[in-house]
């Protein structure tokens, strides 16, 4: 006697092979121009879901306005610039056809009890998602989801550990 899971899997595979399970989605080809992201975005880093050294810890929610400008050499490789209304700018790039990255340094990010301060390295990673909130990848979407992660240097403030704050973020195209 076969386990139910094996029989169910065989039936599903057979149904898919003969088309009973319904039509398969059609593939859509994207051009490099459709993959590039350009425009003005509201960027919200969601503080109440922040992790402080891998432990959930409420941080303030932050909102920035970014101007993104990019061009792509292929549908998988893109390069550009992000300019924040907070006064910084950084390289914007994508190497895999879906995920975008921007990195910059945050001066005086980690403050110590003795009055010294250390620079943090902030990395933003994000990808376009279905605007309905499902979280599914959707190239060309005006909504993006991702992470905002800042890491301080090991040894700062007398601690042999990096201070790391990681929080989810959302980008909404506003112009």
Language-model segments: residues:
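Extracytoplasmic/secretory-pathway segments with low complexity and glycosylation-like composition
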Residues: 2, 16, 31-35, 48, ...
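Edge beta-strand at a domain terminus
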Residues: 145-175
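Secretory targeting and sorting signals
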Residues: 1-29
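Tryptophan-anchored aromatic micro-motifs
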Residues: 31-56, 82, 144-149, 171
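Residues that flank catalytic or metal-binding motifs in active/ligand-binding sites
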Residues: 37, 64, 165-167
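Internal, hydrophobic beta-strand segments that form the core of beta-sheet-rich folds
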Residues: 120-155
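Flexible, membrane-facing loop/turn or short amphipathic-helix motifs
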Residues: 48-57, 110-117, 152-162
């Amino acid at each position: 006697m076969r386990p139910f899971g094996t029989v169910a899997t065989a039936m599903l595979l057979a149904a898919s092979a003969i088309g009973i399970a319904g039509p398969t989605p059609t593939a859509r080809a994207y051009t490099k121009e459709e993959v590039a992201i350009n425009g003005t975005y509201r960027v919200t880093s969601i503080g109440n879901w922040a992790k402080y050294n891998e432990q959930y810890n409420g941080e303030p929610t932050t909102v920035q306005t970014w101007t993104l400008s990019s061009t792509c050499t292929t549908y998988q490789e893109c390069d550009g610039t992000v300019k924040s209304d907070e006064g910084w700018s950084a390289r914007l790039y994508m190497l895999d056809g879906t995920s975008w990255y921007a990195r910059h340094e945050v001066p005086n990010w980690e403050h110590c009890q003795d009055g010294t301060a250390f620079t943090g390295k902030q990395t933003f990673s994000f990808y376009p998602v279905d605007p309905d909130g499902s979280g599914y990848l959707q190239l060309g979407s005006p909504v993006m989801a991702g992470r905002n992660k800042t890491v301080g240097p090991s040894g700062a403030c007398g601690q042999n550990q990096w201070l790391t704050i990681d929080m989810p973020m959302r980008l909404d195209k506003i112009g």
